[in-house]
From Swiss-Prot:
Subunit description: Homodimer which binds Holliday junction (HJ) DNA. The HJ becomes 2-fold symmetrical on binding to RuvC with unstacked arms; it has a different conformation from HJ DNA in complex with RuvA. In the full resolvosome a probable DNA-RuvA(4)-RuvB(12)-RuvC(2) complex forms which resolves the HJ.
The protein, known as: Crossover junction endodeoxyribonuclease RuvC
Annotated source species: Pseudomonas putida (strain ATCC 47054 / DSM 6125 / CFBP 8728 / NCIMB 11950 / KT2440)
Cofactor: record remark: Binds 2 Mg(2+) ion per subunit.
GO BP annotations listed: DNA recombination; DNA repair
Record has Cell division as a keyword: no
Record-level Gene Ontology MF annotations: crossover junction DNA endonuclease activity; DNA binding; magnesium ion binding
Enzyme Commission code: 3.1.21.10
Binding site for Mg(2+) 1: 8, 139
Catalytic residue positions: 8, 67, 139
Binding site residues for Mg(2+) 2: 67
Catalytic activity: Endonucleolytic cleavage at a junction such as a reciprocal single-stranded crossover between two homologous DNA duplexes (Holliday junction)
Essential cofactor(s): Mg(2+)
Any one Gene Ontology cellular component term annotated for this protein: Holliday junction resolvase complex
Amino acid sequence: MTLILGIDPGSRITGYGVVRQTARGCEYVASGCIRTGSGELHERLQIVFRGVSEIIAQHGPVTMGIERVFMARNADSALKLGQARGAAIVAAAEAGLEIAEYSATQVKQAVAGTGGANKEQVMMMVMHLLKLTQKPQIDASDALAIALCHAHTRSSLVPHGLTTARRRGGRLRL
């Protein structure tokens, strides 16, 4: 049994989802959103860092999946997103979690079967896979999808004797 944290980073709303990976699949543990309000950027980043740290302390995940930054039309938005992502990564690294990064296409492919799935399709698959009876908030749904993608990736590596794949540089850590 492994607890996995999924993070959908944002400078105003950061979604989180925690799932328990068992031999039979994944089970829902918790999800929600860290809302930072409209303060100064450094204050919002601190809220993201503290929020992720609290979630880790409360639920005790051992690994985290996080969405990669995509280049939006607005470079300023992409930079802020990257900074929020960095705050979440530092919180996880401070807690000793293994960290993996996934593109939005990888997450959609793993959860919905197609990299072109829309948010509603991803949410419906998250609800189906985790047997949820109520729709989660959209950012929480995305975070749960990231956690499911990470669980799927981890389980496909474990049978080959690999515990963590380092995508950068093509090196594997056994």
